[in-house]
C-alpha cells in the first residue's frame, strides 16, 4: 500500500488549475473509475490494483457508520471532500441521516450526482471547505476522509469547521496519515519521489505531511489507533484489513466546557 499517497478527494481552497493537476494524478494512478464501479465502492474486484486499499477504506467506513448509527439524536452530516460520493452514499443509506457531500472538484461532484442521485436524503454541492456553511444546512457532524493531507494549514481548517458545528457536535478525521514527531520529513521525501516518478512533481507541494501535534488544543479522541496493541494484533488475523490510519473524533466543546478551559 502506498501510504504516502493514499486515495481520496481533495478538499482545499484551490484554483481550477490545481484541480486539473489533481485529476491528472488520479488518471495516471489509475484511480478514475467508471460509474458502474463507483456505484459498488468500496467493494472492488480482487484484480483491482488498489484492492487492499479499498479493504482498508471499507474497514474505516464500517467503523464510522456503526458509530453514527448509534447516535441518540438526529444527525445532519456534511462530508467535506466527498469526491465521487461513495462514502456519503454509504452513510446516507446506513445511518438514516440527511447527508450533504461537498467538494471543489466539479468532475467528481458530477459523477457523484449521476451515480448516487437517487439515494434518499443525500445531495452533493460544489463548495470549498473554507467557504462551507453559507448556503448549506448547519450540520451536527462533519466527516473528512482522506482529506487533511491536501490542506496546508490543518488546524485553521479544523477550527473553521468546528465553528460551523453546534456545541457538542463532532468532526471525524479518517483515512489520512498523521505522523509522529520526526517522521514527517522522511515521508515528505518519499512523496516527492513518488510524484516525480509519476511525472507530476508539482503535486508534491500540495500533499502535506501533518504530525499528530495538529490536534493540540482540540478536544480530540482516537476511536481507532493503528499503533495500539489490539489494532496490531487484528492486522495479523487472516482476512482482516484494518485501516493503517487513525480515526479521530474532535468535539466542539459545550460553551460551559469552553469557558472553564479558558479560565
Which residues are covered by each model-predicted region?
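Conserved alpha-helix/loop element of class I SAM-dependent methyltransferases that forms part
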Residues: 53-73
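Class I SAM-dependent methyltransferase SAM/SAH-binding core
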Residues: 86-131
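A short glycine-rich, Lys/Arg-flanked "PGG" loop and its adjoining helix->strand segment in the class I
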Residues: 155-170
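Conserved class I S-adenosyl-L-methionine
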Residues: 172-195
Amino acid at each position: 500500500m502506498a501510504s504516502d499517497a493514499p486515495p481520496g478527494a481533495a478538499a482545499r481552497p484551490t484554483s481550477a488549475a490545481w484541480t486539473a493537476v489533481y485529476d491528472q494524478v488520479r488518471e495516471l494512478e489509475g484511480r478514475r473509475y467508471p460509474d458502474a464501479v463507483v456505484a459498488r465502492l468500496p467493494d472492488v474486484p480482487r484484480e483491482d490494483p488498489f484492492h487492499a486499499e479499498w479493504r482498508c477504506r471499507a474497514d474505516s467506513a464500517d467503523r464510522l457508520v456503526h458509530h453514527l448509527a448509534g447516535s441518540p439524536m438526529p444527525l445532519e452530516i456534511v462530508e467535506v471532500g466527498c469526491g465521487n460520493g461513495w462514502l456519503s452514499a454509504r452513510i446516507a443509506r446506513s445511518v438514516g441521516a440527511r447527508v450533504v457531500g461537498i467538494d471543489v472538484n466539479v468532475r467528481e461532484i458530477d459523477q457523484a450526482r449521476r451515480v448516487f442521485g437517487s439515494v434518499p436524503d443525500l445531495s452533493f454541492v460544489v463548495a470549498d471547505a473554507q467557504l462551507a456553511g453559507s448556503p448549506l444546512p448547519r450540520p451536527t457532524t462533519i466527516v473528512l476522509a482522506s482529506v487533511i493531507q491536501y490542506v496546508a494549514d490543518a488546524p485553521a481548517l479544523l477550527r473553521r469547521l468546528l465553528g460551523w458545528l453546534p456545541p457538542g457536535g463532532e468532526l471525524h478525521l479518517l483515512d489520512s496519515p498523521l505522523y509522529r514527531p520526526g517522521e514527517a520529513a522522511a515521508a515528505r521525501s518519499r512523496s516527492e519521489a513518488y510524484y516525480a516518478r509519476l511525472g507530476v512533481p508539482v503535486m508534491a507541494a500540495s500533499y502535506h505531511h501533518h504530525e499528530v501535534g495538529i490536534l493540540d488544543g482540540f478536544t480530540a479522541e482516537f476511536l481507532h489507533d493503528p499503533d495500539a496493541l489490539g489494532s496490531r494484533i487484528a492486522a495479523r488475523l487472516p482476512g482482516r484489513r484494518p485501516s493503517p490510519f487513525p480515526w479521530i473524533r474532535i468535539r466542539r466543546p459545550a460553551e460551559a466546557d469552553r469557558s472553564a478551559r479558558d479560565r
